[in-house]
Amino acid sequence: MRNDVRMVDQEPQTTFPSSAELTAESVVDAAAPMGPVISPDGRLVAYAVVANGGEGGRPRGAIWVGAVDGSTAPRRLTDGTARELAPKWAADSGSVFFTSDREERDTAQLARIGVNGGEAEALTSWRGGIADYCPLFDGRTVAVLAEDEGGDERQDEGRDAEGDDVKVWGRHLPVTRLRLLDLDSREVRTVEGLGDRHVVEVAQRPDGGPLAVLSWSTAELDPGVATAELHVVDPGSGAVYELGPVGMEAQSPVWWYDGGLWHLAHVAVSGGQVIGGLAVLDSVLPTAGPQTTEAAEAAEAAVEYRDLTAGMPVCPTELVQVADGPPLALFADGLDTALYRLDPESLRFDRLACAPGTLSGLTASRSGGTCALLASTAYEPENVHAGPVGGPLVRLSDTRPELRTVRWGVQERLSYRASDGLPLDGLLILPAGRGRDEGPFPLVTMVHGGPYFRYSDEFNLNPMDSGQWLATAGYAVFLPNPRGGSGHGHAFAATAAGAVGGGEWTDILGGVDLLIAQGVADPERLAISGWSHGGFMAAWAIGHTDRFKAAVMGAGISDWGMQAGTGEWGVIDAALGGSTGWEGPGPHVHDRNSPISYASQIRTPVLILHGEQDTNVPLGQAIHFHRALRHFGVEHEFVVYPREGHWLRERGHQLDVLRRIRAWYERWL
């Protein structure tokens, strides 16, 4: 049954104060909360606050703690001079674990600090750092995920200096292993029974029993993400029991207990497919009670998974373990996010509450009656909220109060139908201080990445391609949610398989036409932009119409065949593009779906932005497109950001992107 209780209030706003100008610095130098977690006793919430401005313009972070009921103001536990993240509570609620790169920049180690502050205690000095960790319920052990330490660092440096640093593909590839750290002795024991599998997640059974471990065959995303397996590990003996393969993009293993049986649920792509919506899949481990691990031993024969979300018109985004009850989950629901709890009797999720915009980072008390999470609405940036499940929640953090004096563009929710009748949604941000009746305006269409992603009714201000950044400069901004994205169930998402640039393109164009017909958009001043898959769509659009007067292609794909062969998500990219180059001489589906194939038809000026060290969408995609545009004499600007990956981290580069995109539109619109 649908429940429309609002967890986080959002009042409609049409006017704003105008005492402050939105600068690129105010966008980039923002503090953002991350990773809230409720203490075992249910009284406190710990979280990290990350901000730019560290050494080299890279982010730094600090650990904060606040009362769940908001009775006392949050306080900072660490000084924030390093990158301190990922807080997790000790079993007695007396201290907080976290990761810190204080000793070596970009090398995370495990640390601990008392809830009342004081000096933080370093717990590891693992060469190469740790990838993740999980404090166990015995209070004496921490499960740590880390690569092997390897040989002497000076020997490695010597080999590099002599040129003896060759890389043989697939040989000696580092994998993250499961290790158990004894907090008293500081001894580390590696669980050898997992072999050379790459461990990506671990969750302990709430009664202090075995660990659920999710692993890949290799640390490489391709084929790692397609070769996930679940295991159950006894932390005492180190014994490993195999539960077998799980689906594409498997994540978030959680335990729950019902009727004498332990269940182990996780999230993966629905129906065993490569492309589609995520689903919650559940298995029963046969045992008479919670006290032993023979459940996993019996499960070695065969494990069956039941799809608990089959037929739901929403998409799970987070699945959260509750110590004394069934799991909670967040679901993307169109432009909103809803909170659900699993009903143990029906094995279906019951909707508890809904909030406009985005909810994330869900954490729950032992009973599941209290929760904390991150929430962002149309005019409020992401902050930590806490309170009873179902709401109302109290805002604990307030990381960007200065933004309340900025005049924002009014953000409207849109709903319309595609040319084939498919219901669609999206957002429109009007120019700051302007109303619909003052149009038409120059319109920038910003396409989201993924494609399995969405725009929600949240605060749209980020360093890459920001809706409100453009709205404060006088542009209307259209944020479409075309088919292939999340928030509308599995079938909606699965339409992208082998068909990128098809239905999603006509969905976007239909929204643009609607805004022109309504008098909002000026048909002579249209632009399109996006990052990642959005960058692909921008490149695709200008190869199929001359209606756009400017385009921005950020970290976008120009050639799906090349992307399948060189991108780190190759197996998924091959499914999106529809084929690979090694399937024969062609013709290939991926050529039909690639913007590079239509470069001769492009007349629109293009700004190409790309990180030099991008492994998700390698730089070659941008170079390929740049050379094609140069060949055909198309006006364009090609910008490469040194040291950057798929998302830009350095402050100077983020500032450049914001200013350069605005300048590009000012020039052409």
Where do the PLM segments sit?
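Active-site-proximal cap/loop segments of hydrolase catalytic domains
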Residues: W469, L479-L669
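Hydrophobic beta-strand positions that form the internal "hydrophobic ladder"
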Residues: G42-V45, V96-F97, V142-A143, L211-A212, ...
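Short loop/turn segments that connect beta-strands within beta-propeller blades
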Residues: A67-S71, G114-G118, D182-R186, D234-G238, ...
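Residue-level detector of Asp-centered blade-edge/turn motifs that repeat once per structural unit
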Residues: P40-D41, A91-D92, F137-D138, P206-D207, ...
